[in-house]
Amino acid sequence: MPAANIRALEKARGLAADVIILDLEDAVAPEEKDAARERAVRLLPDYAPRETVIRINPAGTPWHQADLEAAAKSGADAILLPKLTDPEQVIRARADARNIALWAMIETPRALFSALAIADAGARCLVLGSNDMLHAMEGRHREDRANLHTAMSLCVLAARAAGITALDGVHNDLDAAQDFRNACVMARDFGFDGKSVIHPSQIAAVNQAFSPSPDDIAYARRVLDAFAREPGKGVITLDRRMLEALDADIAARILARAGL
């Protein structure tokens, strides 16, 4: 959510999103940076009880330190660090971030190949910056995202290795609703925990893709019930399909995601 866009900030109060990210970076012109910073900090309480994150400007820019210090005192749930290239940037930010969690944008080739080190340096969430990554790759947007599959996999694998969250990047075409739904399902199937959006019209599709369906929940319960009926067995069958311990773990994860 651009912290320079007052109308968008007001509308965000009623959005059905799990996390509100107030952006001080790409969506804010240089002459508006200071005002946007003040506005983001001031309006932050308006978005409770949802999780709030402030994306600050990158290290090396004139606004980075002021953004970092203001965000650290803001009461935000996390600070999102963009344009990372190495874990040392996370370590340096940690010194000024107080007790606020750090999220890391994985949007440069160096960040991608250092994703696990960035996570181990203290990031609590990896956010794939697909637009900047494609720009750095000198690639083009594709409907099937085939040129981003490696980046998507590496981002998720690093997050899983570190035991933290991974979020997929944005989808730019607001008119291609089916393409966006497909992108959400793809991100879910790659293992991402959620997806960034750039417009309120995209929220419902993300929530649907990343929320277990009634059929998912019913089957997960059947799996756990089947294991409960045969305690001590490592392998069982259900509907003529072999199930092992990892299937019970998947079922439990589905129910946990559904809040059950």
Language-model features, listed with the residues they occupy:
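Expand to "…catalyze enediolate/carbanion chemistry for C-C bond making/breaking, isomerization
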Residues: M1-L260
